[in-house]
Amino acid sequence: MLATGYGEQAALQTIKAANVDSEMGRVVVACVNSPASTTLSGDEPAVLYISEMLRSAGVFTRKLKVETAYHSHHMENVASSYLKSLQGLSSTEIRSDVEFHSSVTGRRKTSDFGPAYWVENLVSQV
């Protein structure tokens, strides 16, 4: 995973311009941290290639010290076992005085916090 000093649109344009899907693997915008900060995730050769592209253009990058490409296609391998492990859990009652904003949708969320939501959070952009 790679933290960048690029916003979402600039990061998406860079991924498209890199044209890495065919040779080096896939890269996605995993996290939109702010209007000027994203985290990329995916296949390491492609992520490293894009990192060099960005550095050459003077854009901040930092490789994250993680062993897994979270919020990418890599998480699809564990999604079903994650779903099964969450099946028996129940959530506590939702408090109306506390607002929850979904990192998946970016909007306020008031219901449907079941296992499927947390799997979506695992495999999707946040």
Can you say where each PLM-predicted feature lies in the sequence?
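Short amphipathic alpha-helices in soluble, non-transmembrane regions
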Residues: I15-A18, V47-A57
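Generic recognition of flexible, low-complexity loop/linker segments
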Residues: G25-V28, G88
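A generic structural motif
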Residues: A36-S41
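Short amphipathic alpha-helix segments
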Residues: A3-E23
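Helix N-cap motif at beta-to-alpha junctions
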Residues: E8, G42-V47
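Acyltransferase
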Residues: L2-A3, L12, R55-V126
